Amino acid sequence: MSFKVCFRCDAGIHPEIGTGHITRSLFLAKNFISNNMLKKKDILFLTRNDKGFKLGKKYLEKENFKFKYYSNNELSPNSSSESKIINNFGGNLIILDRLKTKKSFIKSIKQNGKKVVTFDDLGDGREISDLAVSAIFSDIEQSKNLKKGLNY
């Protein structure tokens, strides 16, 4: 099945990740729907389900969004397996909500004709994403694709 928008985010009880990434992604997905931009059936979430990351699945089940969950090895950030999964399921727009995306990873998605948006990404991948949004990190160097500050 093909989706129009694919969110790639996690949630967990982990030192480096809490629930902010998936909370923001759910907020965006709900706004796409409430503003009649998308239907729920057009949205897919990809998330990890290993120990420490099971909160993502719980949030998505509660909100009744379609999702696929994978092991940490399969969706390890910036891995070729993660890229393959996204390219197989992902729609026209891929939304990545995480901190350290690599350029090579973004390239592997964009070469398949997909648009990529990143949120609060400190990795060099944000430099080549179609849109980078940084509401939290205001000290990131400005670029033409970056929107930063609390307005975003």
Locations of the language-model features?
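Histidine-anchored nucleotide/phosphate-binding helix
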Residues: 19-36
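Conserved nucleotide-sugar phosphate-binding/catalytic loop shared by glycosyltransferases and other
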Residues: 34-83
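Short beta-strand/loop segments at the ligand-binding rim of alpha/beta enzyme cores
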Residues: 109-118
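A nucleotide-sugar donor-handling region in carbohydrate enzymes
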Residues: 128-152
